[in-house]
């Protein structure tokens, strides 16, 4: 079966003055439809770059990243943009952008502009998804400027889910300080994926975010190691190459 998302020998470097920073080194992975994949790694391990490549926001220097069998590097920037607004949704908890004078329901509804829905239909879908993530009718009418971190994170999830993606990519999805709020959010995320038969690719330095995933991977020093055994993390030894600096 063709994987929904695949990396094959992907390498990514970033220029830094006269040097090149090696971020990902010959990474290969597969994410199949309806399967959840977790990537555990410390800061600057390469996991955020991995997710940017998976979403088509960035392209590899070598190797291939394919979605549904199609190489993203062969797509136009417009095609990748439409993919990211449709079949793929990307969420990062520290990437909150909202009009402070906009209501929560309108903030979610406006993300559906490419779906061909009327505004009434968009608002109806937004209200339904907000309810599913624990934001009731009253909360949906609040202004986005009034939301705390926990509420913003749930609204961001609703905005991602409203587009009904095949693959949801999450980078450190829950940064709220309260452990109970984080655990509640992770449980909500897993339930949403199951109910929608949606694939997940989640990267975090917090193991709680990765509980219950089907495949758990570890990234360190730009290299990825995987195991098919649920709940097992394989850590790679740190390794530096002469003349190459690593950055996540």
Regions found by a protein language model. Give the residues of each.
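Q-loop/switch helix immediately C-terminal to the Walker
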Residues: 94, 101-113
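Conserved ABC ATPase "signature" region
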Residues: 121-138
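Conserved ABC ATPase signature
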Residues: 143-149
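Helix-to-loop junction immediately C-terminal to a conserved catalytic motif
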Residues: 55
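ABC ATPase NBD coupling module
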Residues: 72-88
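Conserved catalytic motifs of ABC-family nucleotide-binding domains
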Residues: 164
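Conserved ABC transporter NBD signature motif
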Residues: 63-71
């Amino acid at each position: 079966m063709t994987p929904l998302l695949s990396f094959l020998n992907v390498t990514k470097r970033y220029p830094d003055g006269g040097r090149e920073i090696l971020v990902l080194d010959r990474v290969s992975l597969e994410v199949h439809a309806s399967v959840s994949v977790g990537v555990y790694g410390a800061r600057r391990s390469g996991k955020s770059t991995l997710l940017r490549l998976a979403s088509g926001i960035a392209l590899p220097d070598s190797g291939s990243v394919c979605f549904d069998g199609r190489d993203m590097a062969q797509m136009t920037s417009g095609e990748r943009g439409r993919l990211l607004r449709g079949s793929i949704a990307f969420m990062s908890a520290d990437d909150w952008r909202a009009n402070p004078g906009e209501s929560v329901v309108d903030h979610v509804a406006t993300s559906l502009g490419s779906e061909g829905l009327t505004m009434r239909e968009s608002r109806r879908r937004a209200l339904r998804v907000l309810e599913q993530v624990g934001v009731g009718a009253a909360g949906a009418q609040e202004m986005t400027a009034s939301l705390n971190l926990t509420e913003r994170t749930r609204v961001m999830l609703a905005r991602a889910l409203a587009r009904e993606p095949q693959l949801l990519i999450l980078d450190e999805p829950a940064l709220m300080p309260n452990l109970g709020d984080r655990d509640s959010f992770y449980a909500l995320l897993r339930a949403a994926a199951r109910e929608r038969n949606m694939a997940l690719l989640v990267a975090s330095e917090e193991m709680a975010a990765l509980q219950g995933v089907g495949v758990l991977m570890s990234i360190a020093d730009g290299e990825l190691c995987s195991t098919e055994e649920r709940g097992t993390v394989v850590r790679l030894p740190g390794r530096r190459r002469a003349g190459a600096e690593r950055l996540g």
